[in-house]
Structures are given as C-alpha cells and as structure tokens.
C-alpha cells in the first residue's frame, strides 16, 4: 500500500461544493470551440444551423449556447430516432422542455415532436441531412460509423465537430479527415471545457468560495 494522498471529487452538486455551470460546461465549451473554427474561416454562429445527437447535459448545453449566440439546433437525435425542428430548439420553453423530457424518460425524444408539432423520424440518425452547416455528435461512443460517415461526406456539410467521448469509429474518423471539403475537430480538444471547469471547481473548493456563472464562463 502506497502513501496516503489527498484527492478531490468534481462534478458535485452546487449544494455540496460543486461549481455553477459544471453540467453545461462541456456543451458551452464545444460551442466556443466551434466559434473559433468558424472565425478562422471568416464566419460566425449567427444564423448557423446545427444537427447533433444527444440531449443530456452536453447536448442541452450546446442547444442553449447556440441559441444564445444566434444559431439554432434544427436536428437532434436520441435513442428512438431524430427530431427536425426547422425553427430550432430556441427559447426557454423548448429548452426547459428538453430538461423535463430527459428527466422523465432519457430514452425517447419523440415527446418533443408531440409537444411542438415538428417532425420525428423513428429509428434513424440525422447524419447525412443536407440543410445544416455543422454536425455535432454529442451522445454515445461510436455513434458515427463508416456507413454514417459516408452519408456525412456526401451531404456536403462543411464542419464535423466531435463533442462526445470517441463519438466516431476509428475508420470513420480517418475517412472523414480525408475529405477535403470537411473541417473535422477532434473530441479531445472540443470537449476539454468540462475538465477545465472541474479544475475551476476544485479551485473554488480550495478557497471555500463560489464563483458566479459569469466568473466561471
């Protein structure tokens, strides 16, 4: 047995010493990363259309920050299929409903379509849709395999931003990185903000203080 060493837990609830914005941090950071990628090409998030997978903490954070910066998530997928909302997941009503929906049943996103009268495609993923500007896989590992990667390449969409942990199979990622029209951002860089805010959480704990949302962000 080695020497005893002090450790720390992160991702705690705010009431037990956690940091404000920790649940949203990975999603917010992914959008900030995307903003820098777009800036390099002389573009911005205003008017941007996003197709993504997932609506957990990370996915919800993406939806919220994209909305705040003037873009919109027009497609999002869950385990049971995908949603197409041409107006985007925008505004408090829709964003709050996402929170309620996943709390009641995280395996089904169809209730969103029922609530807001938009399209739901059962048993499919949204990779390959053409009327968006960026794809952001933010759910499970290996979400995008070679079959979906080919659809993504054929769509002509110019940006593929990995947000989840290893959301793309190795062969699919290699294939996507070969596409000259496609800018690919790897997950280890894109989702680093979650870990960064964990560090900020421990810094707050060490000082026995809480930072405001503005200070954390």
Question: How should these model regions be labeled?
Answer:
Residues 1-20:
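N-terminal ligand-binding/catalytic initiation module
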Residues 4-9, 75-78, 120-122, 136-137, ...:
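General beta-strand structural signal in soluble alpha/beta enzymes
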Residues 12, 21-24, 28-131:
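Glycine-rich phosphate/diphosphate-binding loop of Rossmann-like nucleotide-binding domains
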Residues 17-21, 25, 53, 126, ...:
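Alpha-helix capping and helix-loop boundary segments enriched in small/acidic/polar residues
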Residues 34, 63, 148-149, 173:
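Generic hydrophobic/aromatic pocket-lining and core-packing "Φ" positions
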Residues 58-62, 143-147, 168-170, 192-194:
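Short glycine/serine/threonine-rich phosphate/pyrophosphate-binding segments
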Residues 120-134, 142-159:
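Rossmann-fold NAD(P) dinucleotide-binding segment
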Residues 153-217:
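Adenosine-phosphate binding glycine-rich loop
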């Amino acid at each position: 047995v080695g020497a005893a060493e002090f450790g720390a837990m992160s991702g705690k609830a705010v009431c037990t010493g956690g940091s404000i914005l920790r649940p949203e941090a990975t999603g917010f950071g992914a959008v900030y990363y995307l903003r820098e990628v777009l800036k390099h090409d002389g573009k911005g998030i205003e008017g941007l259309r996003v197709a993504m997978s997932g609506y957990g903490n990370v996915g919800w954070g993406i939806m919220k920050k994209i909305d705040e910066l003037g873009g919109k998530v027009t497609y999002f997928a869950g385990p049971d299929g995908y949603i197409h909302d041409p107006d985007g997941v925008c505004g408090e009503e829709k964003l709050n409903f996402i929170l309620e929906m996943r709390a009641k049943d995280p395996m089904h996103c169809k209730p969103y379509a029922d609530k807001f009268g938009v399209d739901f495609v059962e048993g499919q993923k949204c990779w390959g849709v053409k009327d968006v500007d960026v794809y952001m896989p933010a759910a499970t590992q290996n979400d995008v395999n070679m079959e979906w990667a080919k659809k993504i390449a054929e769509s002509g969409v110019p940006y593929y931003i990995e947000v989840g942990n290893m959301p793309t199979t190795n062969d699919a990622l290699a294939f996507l990185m070969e596409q000259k029209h496609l800018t690919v951002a790897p997950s280890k860089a894109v989702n680093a903000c979650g870990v960064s805010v964990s560090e900020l959480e421990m810094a707050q704990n060490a000082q026995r203080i809480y930072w405001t949302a503005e200070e954390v962000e």
